[in-house]
Amino acid sequence: MSLPASFDLTAEDAKLLLAANVHLGAKNCQVHNEPYVYKTRPDGVNVINIGKTWEKIVLAARIIAAIPNPEDVVAVSSRTFGQRAVLKFASHTNGSAIAGRFTPGSFTNYITREFKEPRLIIVTDPRTDSQAIKESSYVNIPIIALTDMDSPSEFVDVAIPCNNKGKHSIGLIWYLLSREVLRLRGVLPNRTEAWSVMPDLYFYRDPEEIEQTAEEEAEAAEGAEFEVEEEEVEQEWQEPAEADWNASAPPADWNDAANAEAF
């Protein structure tokens, strides 16, 4: 698929894709995913062509931007590494997100509390999100999926070839997809201007790591306050001047004392 020059993959985005290991696919490869393989390493890992990954990101963004109501686009992720990413995607694009376990019947049973009628769904992994894909096929909902080389592509309309098992890879794909959607909608009018949101915001973070970081920041803040208090006390308290005990007292005038007693 040829893209206009303005949609070409930039050197900065290519570096991001390589740094996040988006190009490292699975060792097993489905027949329908062979066109996305750049080469196979001696250890059996299939290297994904990031040029084709970028083309599919642009195609998916154009489909998403064509939906009149952004809330009709639902991002789904049962995989833990993708739950934070889909929530951020829905927040930035004004869409909907299903993070965590997908409740069966969400797209087919209108009695359920979580019932939705989306016009498009995006899944993080066709294997872990198979229930959402299956129900979407029943009601003719188009499906965009992040697919690895060993991922099934049944009922998937647009496959974005990438490493859908790494937390950095998943987060970066959702980040680039969000940014491209905002560019097509005109929210980011200048394609050469950098987005103020960093890719790190889409990366999965371990809850224990978050708690540890918060504790370290709290300890650092307490230490800084204690240092400030010490400085204030030192400034307020001044050491008294030392007395000169070697200095001799002025001689007493005994004549004046005798005259005073006489009076």
Swiss-Prot record:
Acidic residues biased stretches: 211-242
Function: Required for the assembly and/or stability of the 40S ribosomal subunit. Required for the processing of the 20S rRNA-precursor to mature 18S rRNA in a late step of the maturation of 40S ribosomal subunits.
Domain of life: Eukaryota
Cystine connections: none
Keyword Cytoplasm: yes
Region of interest: Disordered: 211-263
Name this polypeptide is given: Small ribosomal subunit protein uS2
Subcellular location: Cytoplasm
Species whose genome carries this gene: Komagataella phaffii (strain GS115 / ATCC 20864)
Modified residues (N-acetylserine): S2
SUPFAM superfamilies on file: Ribosomal protein S2
Keywords tagged on the record: Acetylation, Cytoplasm, Ribonucleoprotein, Ribosomal protein
Gene of this entry: RPS0
Entry's Gene Ontology cellular component terms: cytosolic small ribosomal subunit
Subunit structure and binding partners: Component of the small ribosomal subunit. Mature ribosomes consist of a small (40S) and a large (60S) subunit. The 40S subunit contains about 33 different proteins and 1 molecule of RNA (18S). The 60S subunit contains about 49 different proteins and 3 molecules of RNA (25S, 5.8S and 5S). Interacts with RPS21.
Keyword DNA-binding attributed: no
Protein's GO biological process: ribosomal small subunit assembly; translation
Transmembrane regions: none
Family: Belongs to the universal ribosomal protein uS2 family.
Composition bias type Low complexity, residue spans: 246-263
Single Gene Ontology MF annotation: structural constituent of ribosome
Coiled coil: none
